[in-house]
UniProtKB/Swiss-Prot annotation:
Site ((Microbial infection) Cleavage): A285, R286
UniProt function note: Seems to play a role in epithelial tight junction formation. Appears early in primordial forms of cell junctions and recruits PARD3. The association of the PARD6-PARD3 complex may prevent the interaction of PARD3 with JAM1, thereby preventing tight junction assembly. Plays a role in regulating monocyte transmigration involved in integrity of epithelial barrier. Ligand for integrin alpha-L/beta-2 involved in memory T-cell and neutrophil transmigration. Involved in platelet activation. (Microbial infection) Acts as a receptor for Mammalian reovirus sigma-1.
CDD domains: IgI_2_JAM1 (cd20950), IgV_1_JAM1-like (cd20946)
UniProt domain comment: The Ig-like V-type 2 domain is necessary and sufficient for interaction with integrin alpha-L/beta-2.
Protein name (record): Junctional adhesion molecule A
InterPro entries attached to this UniProt entry: F11R, Ig-like_dom, Ig-like_dom_sf, Ig-like_fold, Ig_sub, Ig_sub2, Ig_V-set
GO cellular component: bicellular tight junction; cell junction; cell-cell junction; extracellular exosome; plasma membrane; protein-containing complex; tight junction
Topological category with respect to the lipid bilayer: Single-pass type I membrane protein
Chief location category: other
Gene Ontology biological-process entries: actomyosin structure organization; cell-cell adhesion; cellular response to mechanical stimulus; establishment of endothelial intestinal barrier; inflammatory response; intestinal absorption; leukocyte cell-cell adhesion; maintenance of blood-brain barrier
Residue numbers on the Extracellular membrane side: 28-238
Amino acid sequence: MGTKAQVERKLLCLFILAILLCSLALGSVTVHSSEPEVRIPENNPVKLSCAYSGFSSPRVEWKFDQGDTTRLVCYNNKITASYEDRVTFLPTGITFKSVTREDTGTYTCMVSEEGGNSYGEVKVKLIVLVPPSKPTVNIPSSATIGNRAVLTCSEQDGSPPSEYTWFKDGIVMPTNPKSTRAFSNSSYVLNPTTGELVFDPLSASDTGEYSCEARNGYGTPMTSNAVRMEAVERNVGVIVAAVLVTLILLGILVFGIWFAYSRGHFDRTKKGTSSKKVIYSQPSARSEGEFKQTSSFLV
């Protein structure tokens, strides 16, 4: 008898729990997207989905984030003026008639209850695919051995942004130079994201023709023109010659000052000394008893 009562109590508890779960499920709201990341070639139509449930009177808004920029695409179930010519609002999402690379970014679907506290949101990432263009490179024609040399590679059109591979004399340069015998004597840092290749320090074996390739997983990878870089020794002769010329010029300057001083071109009169000259002449012989002052002063 006791066992039967315990079973009935357990069944009753399970029934009550099921009712509570059902009521919670009915009262909850959900917002989701069937495709949280969308990749589409440029100039094609695309739909960003946003499904929701649990709202009796839903208010839908869409915003667009790209870096530090935020724009409103849809407000209160209506497309804003800046998008109304090429975007259509649907209860299940928004549709672009044609996308451009500037549309790449994150879109947030925000759903709230009109006059209520219920709220939900979902983010959809849109990547508009654009193949890379031919990259441009900045490579010095010569660089001094032992110094730092920086090579850059970039292209502006690829979406998503391109990654870069460097070549020396047609051979792929690994990210870690010590991993390949061909580059084991080099000391460089290669950044595939920025396209920067830094030699620090540059060695004689780094002389060669350099080019880079840009690829982003869409379209054909593009390769830059090859540019030759010469790793040259520091010109010690020029440095020695410059030092000798400096010493010679300094010697000439010192000699000139000494010569001018010795010739009296500099005033050597001491302060407080009179510049007047006094000439004194002895009296001439005269008769006894006659005396006359003959001193003369010249100014």
